[in-house]
């Protein structure tokens, strides 16, 4: 969808605008709610925004502002981890400068919720989300899944093990981006699930037959060019590549029940009481915003009833590990381990 079309669509006033939210929600059968049925946003609101995907989060904010002219939205931008630490420091000092925190990763969300800065969210808002993504003090916005992009001319699907741990002992040439934050979160999940000893051995094994890239788009492009057989990357890099090159020699494989199929999420936390912060979150969970981020950013909608990006397996068919995503907050042991092995 073109940016202008999205802004106009979200800003357009509809016949349902004046309905109370509870009534509008009852009219919705799929779980997703149209912005036309949401209450207007009025007043001052400060949002701390972690860096989003290619400015698309900024487009969402502009659309919300255009639809709600009486909303005075102030945005502070920065890295999610740095903003989370700022919120914790402000909370300890008894200073409140932010009403909302929208982060690109759950680790940063965990830092804020563990500090006691998050306000509880109402049941009707949480019930819009998939059952496995409903939390009392924060709301996921969109998801991303760890995948194994592979070259379809060099690798057959049956050559790819179901366990990501088994790749350390395979003959496949592997592409990875150890300095990339999402990869480090993936290794953190592996540490939590498998232990430091097994993770250290895995890093050593992979490093023997891996090619290093600066980022995970580079990994996927390297796979497609045949520089490597298989790689580690978030799902959307492959979908973006294939959207511009439908016949690209790359497809997605998924491991089962381990960190290689981890589903992470961007999320938002209400830091102030009252209806305004909560109603702002409702806009992010609206059918229009969820569909926009699925189409343009290839992110996974976590609200029930919204179509996932084309080319991605349905979440219900995947086997991600069961874990508290907020535990991914502390990367320091992971970075120390990666430096010890020599991959950083």
Please give the residue ranges for each predicted region.
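Extracytoplasmic ligand-binding site segments that recognize negatively charged/polar headgroups
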Residues: 41, 46, 50-58, 78-81, ...
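An extracytoplasmic/periplasmic, membrane-proximal ligand-sensing/linker region
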Residues: 301-344
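Short, polar/charged alpha-helical segment
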Residues: 31-46, 50-72
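N-terminal export signals
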Residues: 5-26
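A bilobed periplasmic-binding-protein/Venus flytrap-type ligand-binding module shared by bacterial periplasmic
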Residues: 147-154, 191-192, 262-276, 284, ...
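Periplasmic-binding protein-like
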Residues: 128-131, 144, 174-179, 203-206, 212-213, 284-306, ...
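A ligand-binding cleft/hinge motif common to bilobed small-molecule-binding domains
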Residues: 107-111, 229-249
